[in-house]
Amino acid sequence: PATMTLPVEELESILKTAAEYKKECENINQIETKNDKKRADFVGINMEGPFISPIKKGAQDERNIIPCNEEIAQRFLDASDHLVKFLGIAPEESANAVSFIKNMKDKVNISLAHTNASYETAKEALEAGANHIVHLFNAMTGFTHREPGVVGAASDNEHTMSEIICDGVHIHPSMIRAAFKMMSAERMIFISDSMRATGMPDGQYTLGGLDVKVTGNR
């Protein structure tokens, strides 16, 4: 699962609960058989905030966005008992982004997420040790012939993995095909990026404290 951009204390509480649930699942695994299992394995957490860009916040609450902070990031890792596997940042929003990446990269995978970074800034972040792109094309700089942005930097860095949403709504199928040609299937990760209203009737729902209206498949 992925966390939203929420107050730091609330995120810590969520991460502690997730760690407790993980331990409970491990205890259950010891007594149930493979045929009894009716749930997915909880393998880790993807944090899409709060170190993101207010310009590319998408459905995140701007009030809770903060610059990269190693102390706070360590609190997240500790609260989750290191269940956090991906930590998203917008490198252009923090003067210390490169040092943050270098100091944290051996503890957690650093993603570029909800970012308005230029090609040069994204390239620098990836060379510093970031290795993952959150939902390619969505909530990031555009990909054009003069300003290739985050997509161009990800394409150029062969050590970078990129998520992509293949629901036919977030990205045009032509761009999905183009991404696979640029980066190869081995570097692409299919994600749903779905919320709890997925599969529910049209209506009003909430996402990270924000009101969301569902109409059809949007």
Descriptions of predicted regions:
Residues 1-5, 115, 192:
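Ser/Thr-centric signal marking residues that sit
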Residues 2-8, 89, 162-167:
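Conserved strand-turn element in the central/C-terminal portion of the radical SAM core barrel
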Residues 6-148, 199:
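Histidine/acidic-residue-rich, glycine-tolerant segments that coordinate divalent metal ions
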Residues 121-218:
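Active-site-adjacent C-terminal substructures of enzyme catalytic domains
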